[in-house]
Amino acid sequence: MNGLTVVFAGTPEFGLPCLDALIQSRHHLKAVYTQPDRPAGRGRKLQESPVKEWAINHQIPVYQPLNFKNQEAVDELSALKPDVMVVIAYGLILPKAVLEIPRLGCINVHASLLPRWRGASPIQHAILHGDAESGVTIMQMDVGLDTGPMLCKAACPVTSSDTAGSLHDKLAKMSVKPLLDVLEALASNSAQFELQNNELATYAGKINKEEARINWHQSAVEIDRKIRAFNPWPVAYTLAGELMLRIHQAKATDIMSTEMPGMILNIDKNGMLVATSDNALLVEKIQFPGAKIISVRDWLNSGKTQLHTGLMLQ
């Protein structure tokens, strides 16, 4: 049985473990599609995507169409004659004409247990909503948004200390085996498809920077989830006077508070206790504008005074 001719489409780091596995598998990785280089950083220099960097390092041809609205981009893909297209966080919508090019269709590695958390930010939403588990789903793509039939699922627990960053890394690594299993099933014509139950579907919309501001009138547990869901981006923040204070790490406590939500109750070597709508939140790692991430203990030892008991965080 011959290996499959695979075209990969992806942009961020999430797809790299699968790319590493693909190139070592019996399948033939013929080309990589990724988004065009974008200006990034203070200098606004054009930056290649992690997937493009990987492809160049492994001498795999790279294609970067702006979209697939023009026939030339569609014909270019068609000329590669792929058996299957593997799509992981590509960030471009694939029209029906593209989905029909590969002999075995396009399969997508999605970072949730579908039909829960269809959409752009499944990892963040799993943490925001306190899900006990997350996982990856390999599905056959159709013209809907993450609505296609499922080929394989793999689950993992979401811990109380997981951030979007740590869960991202776990899911990226654990997606390798399900993807390879699905490719083998497709190659041997033994793949089994399960339709999604649309009644159970939830939607994970794109996360915006504007959502990162902490609302101290929420519960300590809800704020803790937000801080973890928005780490490493866009990072939850509050205002200490006129200063933006980013909060990188915190945890809900069982310390009841009757003070106004947002009031700093205490600062010591263990962290900064802040009142919420119920129990206090213990803030452990912070960042002031233009400064490095620092523990509250180290900030306390620095002798600085921007934060103090009784200050209202907004």
Curated annotation (Swiss-Prot):
Disulfide bonds: none annotated. Its EC number is 2.1.2.9. It is an enzyme of class 2 (transferase). Coiled coil: none annotated. One of its GO terms (cellular component) is cytosol. SUPFAM superfamilies: FMT C-terminal domain-like, Formyltransferase. Belongs to the Fmt family. Attaches a formyl group to the free amino group of methionyl-tRNA(fMet). The formyl group appears to play a dual role in the initiator identity of N-formylmethionyl-tRNA by promoting its recognition by IF2 and preventing the misappropriation of this tRNA by the elongation apparatus. This is Methionyl-tRNA formyltransferase. It comes from Legionella pneumophila subsp. pneumophila (strain Philadelphia 1 / ATCC 33152 / DSM 7513). The lineage of its organism: Bacteria, Pseudomonadati, Pseudomonadota, Gammaproteobacteria, Legionellales. The gene is fmt.
